[in-house]
UniProtKB/Swiss-Prot annotation:
Keywords: Cell junction, Cytoplasm, LIM domain, Metal-binding, Repeat, Zinc. The lineage of its organism: Eukaryota, Metazoa, Chordata, Craniata, Vertebrata. Pfam families: LIM, PET. Residues 234-297, 299-359, 362-421 form the LIM zinc-binding domain. It comes from the Eukaryota. The gene is TES. This is Testin. Interacts via LIM domain 1 with ZYX. Interacts (via LIM domain 3) with ENAH and VASP. Interacts with ALKBH4, talin, actin, alpha-actinin, GRIP1 and PXN. Interacts (via LIM domain 2) with ACTL7A (via N-terminus). Heterodimer with ACTL7A; the heterodimer interacts with ENAH to form a heterotrimer.
Length: 421
C-alpha cells in the first residue's frame, strides 16, 4: 500500500466507546465522544482511559502490532480473517480453597494478565510482590490501573500512522522509520525467573547491594566458601536492595543478564509507574515506558498528544505544538498571534477565558478581563479600580488603603463594619 492510500485510510476511531460513562466525572459527563484530534472526550475533557470503554480487543490489536516484525512474535497470533496481529495475553486463573465452618468452597481469582511462564507458582509469587492496588485481578482497581497504563504508556498513535491526525506522506514515512528503529534498538519484554536460574544463561555476575554496576564473581581453583556465598548475592538494579532467596526477579535482555529488578521496581525511569505487561524500552542504561522513550527521542504535541515529525512546529509555555494544534482548549480557535491565558496548563483564548474561567468582581459582578489589574483576597476578587474596590458601607475607595474583609464585603473602618452588621 503506497503512502497516499495510507494517508486516506487514516482515522481516529471516533465510534470507539461512544457514549461510555466517565468513571471520573460520573453524571457530569454526557458520555464519551472523542474530540476530532485531541484524544480526549469532547464533553468532559477526560481521556478515553477514564471512561468505561471495553477496549480489550483494541488493546490486544495495539500490542500485537507493536510486537509485529520483532523477536516477540511468539506473543502474537494473526487472525485468519484479516491478518491483524493480536496480542496473546497470558490470563491466569487461580483456585484457592476457602475453609468455611462446615464446607470447603473454591475461590477463583482471574488475572487479566500474568507473566508468560510455565511455572504457575512463580507467576503467583510475582503477583503477590506487586502492590495490591496494582494486581490486575479482573474487575478490580488493579485491572483498571492496567487498562489506564496500557493507554498511557503505549499510545497507539506512537506506532500507527493511521491513528494520527492528517500526517503528510513524508511524515508517514518518517514515522514508520522511527517505529522500525525503536523496535530493533529499544523494545523489549521482561522475563520472570529465579536469579539462580540465570547462572547457565548469562555470565556469572552479581550486583553489589548499594552499587550501580555488576562485578564478575571470583572464579578459580582457589575459590573459597566466601566467594561461593558472594556469587549468590543479588541486588535490584533500581532500589539496590538485596533480593531474597527464592523470590522471582525480572530480567531485561537489552539491559544484560547481570541486571535484575524486583517485580515492583520494574518501572519507567520517568513516570515511575509499573511497566505494563513488563513491556519496556531500554536507553542509556535506563528503563522507559513507550511514551517516555518516544518523548526522549521526539517532541510531542501538547495539543494532540502525537509525536511531531514535521520540521515546523511551535514552542509555547515550555511545551511543543503542531502549528495547527496551538489552539484554544475550549473552542479550538488558532492562537497564533492572539492573546491567550493558561488554565490548568491549557491555553484558552481571551473570549473563552472571560466566558468560562474568569473570576467575577465582587463590586460590579462582571467578569474580570485577564489583562486588567485586580485585587484578590482569599476567594474574592475585585477590579483594581475606583469604581469597584470600595468600602461596602460608605463607598470610599480602598486601593492602597487598609481594609477589613467580611464574607465578600470590605470595609474601611470598624464603624462602617458595625453599620452593616
Amino acid at each position: 500500500m503506497d503512502l497516499e492510500n495510507k494517508v486516506k485510510k487514516m482515522g481516529l476511531g471516533h465510534e470507539q466507546g461512544f457514549g461510555a460513562p466517565c468513571l471520573k466525572c460520573k453524571e457530569k459527563c454526557e458520555g464519551f465522544e472523542l474530540h476530532f484530534w485531541r484524544k480526549i472526550c469532547r464533553n468532559c475533557k477526560c481521556g478515553q482511559e477514564e471512561h468505561d470503554v471495553l477496549l480489550s480487543n483494541e488493546e490486544d490489536r495495539k500490542v500485537g502490532k507493536l510486537f509485529e516484525d520483532t523477536k516477540y512474535t511468539t506473543l502474537i497470533a494473526k487472525l485468519k480473517s484479516d491478518g491483524i496481529p493480536m496480542y496473546k495475553r497470558n490470563v491466569m486463573i487461580l483456585t484457592n480453597p476457602v475453609a468455611a465452618k462446615k464446607n470447603v468452597s473454591i475461590n477463583t481469582v482471574t488475572y487479566e494478565w500474568a507473566p508468560p511462564v510455565q511455572n504457575q507458582a512463580l507467576a503467583r509469587q510475582y503477583m503477590q510482590m506487586l502492590p495490591k492496588e496494582k494486581q490486575p485481578v479482573a474487575g478490580s482497581e488493579g485491572a483498571q490501573y492496567r487498562k489506564k497504563q496500557l493507554a498511557k504508556q503505549l499510545p497507539a498513535h506512537d506506532q500507527d500512522p493511521s491513528k494520527c491526525h492528517e500526517l503528510s506522506p513524508r511524515e508517514v514515512k518518517e514515522m514508520e522509520q522511527f517505529v522500525k528503529k525503536y523496535k530493533s534498538e529499544a523494545l523489549g519484554v521482561g522475563d520472570v525467573k529465579l536469579p539462580c536460574e540465570m547462572d547457565a544463561q548469562g555470565p556469572k555476575q552479581m550486583n553489589i547491594p548499594g552499587g550501580d554496576r555488576s562485578t564478575p564473581a571470583a572464579v578459580g581453583a582457589m575459590e573459597d566458601k566466601s566467594a561461593e556465598h558472594k556469587r549468590t548475592q543479588y541486588s535490584c538494579y533500581c532500589c539496590k536492595l538485596s533480593m531474597k532467596e527464592g523470590d522471582p526477579a525480572i530480567y531485561a535482555e537489552r539491559a544484560g543478564y547481570d541486571k535484575l529488578w524486583h517485580p515492583a521496581c520494574f518501572v519507567c525511569s520517568t513516570c515511575h509507574e509499573l511497566l505494563v505487561d513488563m513491556i519496556y524500552f531500554w536507553k542509556n542504561e535506563k528503563l522507559y515506558c513507550g511514551r517516555h522513550y518516544c518523548d526522549s527521542e521526539k517532541p510531542r504535541c501538547a495539543g494532540c498528544d502525537e509525536l511531531i515529525f514535521s520540521n515546523e512546529y511551535t514552542q509555547a509555555e515550555n511545551q511543543n505544538w503542531h502549528l495547527k494544534h496551538f489552539c484554544c482548549f475550549d473552542c479550538d480557535s488558532i492562537l497564533a498571534g492572539e492573546i491567550y491565558v493558561m488554565v490548568n496548563d491549557k491555553p484558552v483564548c481571551k473570549p473563552c477565558y472571560v466566558k468560562n474561567h474568569a473570576v467575577v468582581c465582587q463590586g460590579c459582578h462582571n467578569a474580570i478581563d485577564p489583562e486588567v489589574q485586580r485585587v484578590t483576597y482569599n476567594n474574592f476578587s475585585w477590579h483594581a479600580s475606583t469604581e469597584c474596590f470600595l468600602c461596602s458601607c460608605c463607598s470610599k475607595c480602598l486601593i492602597g488603603q487598609k481594609f477589613m474583609p467580611v464574607e465578600g464585603m470590605v470595609f474601611c473602618s470598624v464603624e462602617c463594619k458595625k453599620m452593616m452588621s
